[in-house]
Amino acid sequence: MPSQDDVQNLPIDITFSRLGEWLVDRKRIPADWRKRVAVIRVKILKEFSSLPKEIDPFFQTLDPEVIGYLEVKKVYEILLKTTPESRNIFGRLSGASGVWEAIVRAFEKDHIYLGEAAQIIIQNVNYEIPYLKKQVQKVQQQMTELDRKEADIKRSVALSATKYEDACRELGLQGNNVRRELLETASSLPSTFSKILEVINSDSVTGAMEYYSAYVQDVHTEKDKPLRIVLQNLKYIRENPPSLSVFGDSEGLDADNIQSSENANGTDAAADSIDWDITVETPEIDWDVSMVEEVDSGNDLGSYEIVNASDIPENSPFKVEESQGLEVDVSEISWDVSVETPQVEEIGDSALLESNQTQLTDSTTQVLGSGGERSQLLETEYRNKILDDLYEVKAFLNQRLIELRNEDTLSLQHHVQAVSPMVLQQYSPETIEPMVVDISMAISLLTNKKSRDLIMILNSKRFLDRLVSELEEKKHREVKLRESLKDVGRRRMELQNSLSAIWPKQEAALSKTRELKELCETSLSSMFDGRPVNIRGEINTLLNAGVSA
């Protein structure tokens, strides 16, 4: 049988969630303790307004709605220290100290404060502290996601900046004023065209053309049949090199459109000022001649003139496509019109017109270069025909390299080479390789993105607008991403402020719960003659987690 000392040392374990019921069941507090606590709170609210808050900073942090026994006791202790002389003739405290002493005594009567402490503990452990913990975790998770988002945005900013710089570098731009720089870069096209013609007229390309022609003549031409003509377009561009000027009608530059408009207006004005003394009735004459728009070549006919089919070279490979619909026998048409140039007296208007046209031409050629004829290399069909021949020669040379280096057919190739004409025997792999390099260079100059874009800029205003829009969109994306970085910074500041507001509340709830637990255990232990009292349950896990955190 356990002794009295053993019984005295046995602990009393109480589950925190049933602490209030346990106190009532064992008659430690009255059953109507809630009503009595409500009465005390009414008195606290009444007296709190008259509390001298300037005495201690603690008073300014109090919320009258949540003041409990611990806060009331601390207020009483502060007032007792600051106003020790506030006592009446009977030795009792008077004024604010006496009022708050009465409130403390009301809490301690019948141990009402234990019921309030049990209620606050259950409220904090089950609801308040878990809610605050979830809020803290939520804010911390949002900050983690924000850090990841910021890292992604920074990578995107760097990538966008790199893409914009690469796009500008590819076009030879600095990126300050894209539209103006694109138009200025168009001045590099004549030098590009010059390099293309230089490569096409080089010795290695000449040798490649001769090698291909001789090979076709030897291998693919039958006896008693005419020789097969190859590489007509390359031969034509070598014999008739196109103009290097990019001057001409272009949608890409407004100055050209203005010039065309001014030319047309000027021609009309000149025509109105001259009496040609010719009456033309359109319904009675069938001209049967197509009208094509050409650049004014200085013959005073304006922007439109009749194309003479005899002006096209006989050996041009482009004659068929460009002269369709113009096969007219001029000698069979009797115009029956006699034109006499009368004396023109309005010299002043003519001189003014020529001066205006000269100014427009000078301003346009600053970007496009001088020259009366627009380069044929600006035309897609013309370039495609040149490329067809270049690709044909390149494919032939690559195939010959494969055949000459194939060890399985090397003996056969030597035999074929021995019976071939002397002109074909001089070409070895070492001779063919430089030809392939130069042919590839010519193809690259014609097909690289910068050349194609600059040609399209001169040929189409819409393409220029689209290209400018694409470049500006890349730059705008970088700016937009940098703005989003600022938004991320502002959001982080908001989360930090929110965390700074929640964290003290959580710590205060944990601290108050710990104090109330110790208060209950100490008070109950004194009621049971010093037997140890332990409040068990989730409260300990929560408080220990708070300490470790």
Curated annotation (Swiss-Prot):
Residues spanned by motif Shuffled ATG8-binding motif 3: 333-336
Cell wall biogenesis/degradation as UniProt keyword: no
GO term, biological process aspect, one: positive regulation of reticulophagy
Segments crossing the lipid bilayer: none
Effect on the protein upon substituting residue 335 to A: Abolished interaction with ATG8 family proteins
Keyword Cell cycle attached: no
Motif Shuffled ATG8-binding motif 1, residue numbers: 274-277
Motif (Shuffled ATG8-binding motif 2): 285-288
Keywords, ordered alphabetically: Ubl conjugation pathway
Function according to Swiss-Prot or TrEMBL: Substrate adapter of E3 ligase complexes mediating ufmylation, the covalent attachment of the ubiquitin-like modifier UFM1 to substrate proteins, and which is involved in various processes, such as ribosome recycling and reticulophagy (also called ER-phagy).
Subunit (UniProt): Substrate adapter component of the UFM1 ribosome E3 ligase (UREL) complex. Interacts with ATG8 family proteins.
Domain statement: The shuffled ATG8-binding motifs mediate interaction with both ATG8 family protein and UFM1.
Family the UniProt entry places it in: Belongs to the CDK5RAP3 family.
Protein name per Swiss-Prot or TrEMBL: CDK5RAP3 protein homolog
Species assigned in the record: Arabidopsis thaliana
Upper classification of the organism: Eukaryota, Viridiplantae, Streptophyta, Embryophyta, Tracheophyta
